[in-house]
Amino acid sequence: MEISFYASNIQPYGTPNGTNVANKNGNGIGTPSTASSTGDVSPQKAKGTEHDFSVQAAIEMAESRQELNREEREKMVEQMNEFVSSINKGVAFRVDEESGRDVVTIYEANTGDVIRQFPDEELLVVLRRLAEHTANSGLLVEKV
């Protein structure tokens, strides 16, 4: 295998290589770099402090977001309560005993008429029948 001359790693005589450039700058091999009296900091130290500042800023931002989120949630709950009370509607929560499902009912506060129920009564009837048949037949086994 031939290596062409222009791919050689040998540098011509008299050109400065990396070691000579480092020595001219005063940062030779084995000598630690220190900050000068003008306040220059080595790139590694600057990078470390820059990283610390960014981490600290991210933590502070996350804490402020949590405070805002908590305040926003409290405000939203307050607004929802005001809205529900202003439209004279009520909300009831119960557990259907036969099907074992949670039921939410929205009703008119003054008259007690049911406006909406989740899940619907028809679905509750189906769930009750399913529970009754599966208990007797053993076809479906409920696993949690």
Swiss-Prot record:
To FlaG in other Vibrio species. This is Protein FlaG. Residues 11-51 are annotated as: Disordered. InterPro entries: FlaG, FlaG-like_sf. Disulfide bonds: none annotated. Residues 11-41 have a biased composition (Polar residues). Signal peptide: none annotated. NCBIfam families: PRK08868.1.
